[in-house]
């Protein structure tokens, strides 16, 4: 998304960040993990601006449970099945560092899934569109046909 605005953007992953959190609720968890990612960025980077983020889904049944990224196709299928035909809240935290000073923002959105048939679930899992995605889906990708944003901004999801 930012690459369209900033053609000379450099995107780098941050390895070995502990993505566990002691926060009680999902919003706190996602913010804490985003802050850990910010701490992992070296202060002497050659960049004018640094952005880190994290996204999690709030379990549709248990508000304090977070749904992150699936580790494999079986977990992805289970997550998509759990979200099928339901609404859920998505939390995103973003940290922006400019001139050595960090500022953090927390946003939420609500997404609703259609009832997903077994065939659609298999198709979504086999497409690998779930890889690296919180809740095992990409609203701007293949899931966009089966889900809609009810509240909030698409950038949050």
List where the protein language model places each region:
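Hydrophobic anchor at the start of a short beta-strand
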Residues: 8-9, 48
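N-terminal beta1-alpha1 ligand-phosphate binding loop
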Residues: 1-7
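A short beta-strand-loop structural module common to alpha/beta enzyme folds
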Residues: 9-20
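Anionic-ligand binding patches
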Residues: 24-156
């Amino acid at each position: 998304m930012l690459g369209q605005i900033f053609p000379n953007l450099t995107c780098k992953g941050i390895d070995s960040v502990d993505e566990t959190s002691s926060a009680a609720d999902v919003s706190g968890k996602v913010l804490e993990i985003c802050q850990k990612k910010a701490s992992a960025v070296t202060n002497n980077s050659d960049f004018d601006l640094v952005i880190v983020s994290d996204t999690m889904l709030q379990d549709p049944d248990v508000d304090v449970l977070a749904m992150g990224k699936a580790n494999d196709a079986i977990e992805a299928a289970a997550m998509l099945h759990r979200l099928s035909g339901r609404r859920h809240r998505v939390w995103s935290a973003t940290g922006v560092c400019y001139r050595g000073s960090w500022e953090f923002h927390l946003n939420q959105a609500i997404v609703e899934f259609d009832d997903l048939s077994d065939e659609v679930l298999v198709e979504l899992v086999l497409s690998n569109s779930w890889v690296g995605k919180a809740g095992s889906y990409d609203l701007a990708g293949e899931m966009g046909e089966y889900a809609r944003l009810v509240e909030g901004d698409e950038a949050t999801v």
